[in-house]
């Protein structure tokens, strides 16, 4: 029997016609995936009304040296909960290494470190996450809802939000314009 394929440290790309507008052109950085379920942070959209400085001020943290970076819409689950995906040069007590590709942190410590100029070299912020129960993601993948690509650091930290989905497909050698939501038999 083959070992199960877990997707931590990879990107999920929504296939055209995924059928859920919340995930249209979604790029999800997978952080946890095992037999009990999966958790990923969406990187395909940003929140229109709040930047990183606004978030810090709401938490009574002076922005200091932090850039006023966009806040990504991490997903529909717990949209008020904040997450930072970042390089491994910073780690807090509750930080989670994700397959050696990036680190996930969700405490005030990382926000304070970023504001003080002592945080990770590269990072992205998000509110909410995408979550799946045990076997749920696998079912969606069998229905051709998602495409998997390696967790490329450049796509995570450097790609512009509105081009990230297409760039991720192209980095895998796939032209997303040629994809369809329909399946057939030969």
Per-region residue spans from a language model:
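A short aromatic-anchored loop/beta-hairpin motif
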Residues: 1-125, 129-186
């Amino acid at each position: 029997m083959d070992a199960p394929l877990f997707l931590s440290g990879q990107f999920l790309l929504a296939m055209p016609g995924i059928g859920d507008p919340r995930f249209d052109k979604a790029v999800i950085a997978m952080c946890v995936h095992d037999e009990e379920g999966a958790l990923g942070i969406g990187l395909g959209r940003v929140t229109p009304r709040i930047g990183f400085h606004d978030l810090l001020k709401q938490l009574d943290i002076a922005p200091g040296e932090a850039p006023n970076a966009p806040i990504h819409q991490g997903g529909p689950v717990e949209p008020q909960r904040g997450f930072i995906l970042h390089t491994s040069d910073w780690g807090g007590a509750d930080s989670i290494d994700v397959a050696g590709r990036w680190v996930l942190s969700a405490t005030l410590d990382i926000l304070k470190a970023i504001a003080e100029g002592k945080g990770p070299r590269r990072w992205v912020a998000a509110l909410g996450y995408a979550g799946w129960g045990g076997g749920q993601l696998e079912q969606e993948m069998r229905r051709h809802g998602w495409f998997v690509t390696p967790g490329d650091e450049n796509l995570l930290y450097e790609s512009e939000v509105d081009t990230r989905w297409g760039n991720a497909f192209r980095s895998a050698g796939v032209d997303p314009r040629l994809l369809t939501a329909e399946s057939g038999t030969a």
